[in-house]
Amino acid sequence: MKVEDKQRLERTEKMMVRWMCGVTLKNRITSEELRNRLSIEAVTEIVRRGRLRWFGHVERKADNDWVKKCTKVEVVGKVGRGRGRKTWLQCVNSDMKDLGLRVGEAQDRQLSRRKIFGETSEPCLH
């Protein structure tokens, strides 16, 4: 996810939370305080958890599975000038670093879930 997309998502979320609470910027109440009142978490954290959950799912697949092969593919050809786009795997690696996860821990489903979702919270399974 691009930084611009992340900022747009956060901005929209803040607007919606304020609208749900009937609060304007003139009331000088922080969005964090409103989120705590409603007991909701930031949408960027939900996206991060989903990304890490999908990574664990892919890592537990067999090595010859096409989904796993697609995550490891490297495109051959000329490389353009400048810094390249951040890949999905780079994003996952930075998320894992933030949470103190290692790639090998994705094999242990219970351990990775505890680290991703926290000790007490469980994901909503429909």
Could you describe each region identified by the protein language model?
Residues M1-H126:
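Short linear motifs embedded in intrinsically disordered, charge-biased segments
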